[in-house]
Amino acid sequence: MIIRMSLASRSVLLIFFLYSLAWAQLPAAPPNPPPDDRYKADILLIVAHPDDDVLAAPYLAKAIYEQHKHVSVIYGTRGNAGGNAVGNEQAASLGAVREIEGRRALASMGILDVWFLNGPDTPGQDVLHSLETWGHGASLEQVVRLVRLTRPEVILTWLPVYVAGENHDDHQAAGVLATEAFDLAGDPVAFPEQVEAPRNRTAISNYGEGLHPWQPKKIYYFSDATHFEFLEGRGPQYKTSDVSPSRGVSYAAIATDAWMNDKSQLPANRVELNQYLNQYLSEPVRFVLGKSLVKGTTMGDVFEGVTPGPIPCVRSREYEPIAQQGISLEFGGPWSYYRKFWRAHNLDHLAQLLSPETALGGPDNSVWVPLLIRNDTDAAKQVILRSVLPSGWKEKPGPMIYSVAAHDTYPVQANLVAPESQKSTWQQLTWTAEADGKPIGSVTLRVHVNYNGVPQ
């Protein structure tokens, strides 16, 4: 049987043949490189100063030597405002010293991928101070960039909560930036120039950075508080006395060897040094689970439920104002900020960790307490503010009448001094407010009268 093809059919076949021949002769495009696996991290530790890593170091040793995890580190500052136990180097010179100390300490545990944000060391306890001096937006941009570069499964960082303890504002700022980056790094609209492909990656003067959005799976926090009961049941804990099967020594010993590189920050006296090391490394490493986007339990291992690979971006709630009515009294400053921050980042459980507290912020036994008088009515109000203090405490400005405009908030800065006789005790400070002859509310602050931190 002979099949006759029409002229049109023969033309189609001829065109197809010619196109196929031309297609076969086209050059292949160069492969599109995947993200650089040299910098892929399992854990990204985000802290403030060289030597901050020591609090998590026993756990990091376990993760590195037993679980073969790759760890990268971001420091917010070089620690240029700290003291120097071994030399006269200060300010920028001390920062240069501490950078080398920090890199050597981490290298002793096999951690080589280390970045510094160039924030100034800012001794204090108010997180808003550090965020201001670091340049909040620019620092966040850098952290998001490094999360996208390292693509960590888990982020470890300082607890973004105001606590009685060292309570360093730089520590808190590191925790804030890490949390914000956790929520933004997977969003291609956040710092979009970072995820734009370069026009010609082998040429100069490109403006697209060629990174990929990346959503970490978990974020855990650790704290510089001087008491630990509020951390119980909030996340996994790791004994520092456990012996590493691969190294034959305790994880505390591995951390101590690393920490010995930070000589500028350690006591020169051997007895004092041992006491200092024991103070920090005798306790277990306690984590608070911030957020998990994979299945697992609060107390489960850090990597419980984590499997390698990208996951979709999960948006946080973002800021939503809470409708309020009438007149109210609340703590201001960092306490006010954290109330909004926790809600915006789906961290409502952090508000339940502990009631408002602080420790004396200087050798003069003083404490600073910011207060806010809110007027959410349509008329101006006269508000009387009084304090209820333990015996012997002194306060400025003391009882006073405040005129608060309609739909306005009046910030009050209370400064108090505790008597020497109450050292090493917990005390309670209360403020009450009334308007139109009626009480409108009160706030209470627990204060540890035991100087153990930087000035407020």
Descriptions of predicted regions:
Residues 25-150, 172, 179-183:
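Active-site rim/loop-helix segments in enzyme catalytic domains that contact anionic ligands
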